[in-house]
Regions:
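Hydrophobic/aromatic-enriched cytosolic interaction surfaces used to assemble or bind macromolecules
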Residues: 1-188
């Protein structure tokens, strides 16, 4: 007999679905995959001898530098440490609080995980990504997220209008300055 009796579900949440999500009576274990409309990304280069807290502080600094004062209210997380650059993700803390409020302690449901769409897609495709890297393309209503993985880790991440991703790849190729870029585009 399995001890895992709770129903598990994954819910994909778009910006126009947040209020409906809050009205739902959830049961079981729930993983929320947030649309990249909710997420901001930046690349954090490895820092010799830096602690995890210092790298997180660097990610927060980069978001503040890029987005200004509004970034102060964001929750920031870093991808797992590896040999190369890491991906930092920021999500407005008020959105996360609204999600958590849907799952009171002792209730019939438990919020197991909240993941931005790019990271959920990456985790699902990780085994298909060649060692030399690939472009990861995640298309959502009205926009696309295009990330580049290189042999040395995360190399770039951009949000563009839904139909602009091919131009963005060409622009990245022209700016590469001799750097080897992947040919493979994984549409996730």
């Amino acid at each position: 007999m399995s001890l895992s009796w709770r129903k598990r579900r994954e819910v994909r949440l778009s910006p126009d679905g947040l209020e409906a999500f809050e009205r739902e009576k959830w049961t079981g274990d729930v993983t929320v995959v947030l649309s990249d409309h909710f997420a901001r990304y930046t690349i954090v280069q490895p820092q010799d001898g830096a602690t995890a807290e210092e790298e997180l502080a660097l990610a927060r600094f980069q978001f503040n530098k890029i987005h200004g004062e509004r970034a102060r209210g964001w929750e920031v997380r870093l991808s797992r440490a590896g040999a190369g650059a890491r991906l930092a993700c920021a999500i407005d803390a008020s959105v996360l609080e609204r999600l958590k409020a849907c799952f009171p302690k002792g209730g019939k449901a438990r919020l197991v995980s909240v993941q931005p769409a790019l990271m959920a897609a990456y985790n699902g495709a990780r085994d298909r990504i060649p060692r030399e890297g690939a472009w990861l393309l995640l298309v959502e209503a009205g926009r696309a997220c295009l990330a580049r993985l290189a042999a040395h880790g995360w190399a770039s991440v951009h949000h563009v209008a839904e139909g602009e991703w091919e131009r963005l790849i060409e622009r990245e190729r022209s700016r590469a300055g001799g750097e080897s870029l992947p040919d493979l585009v994984l549409k996730l």
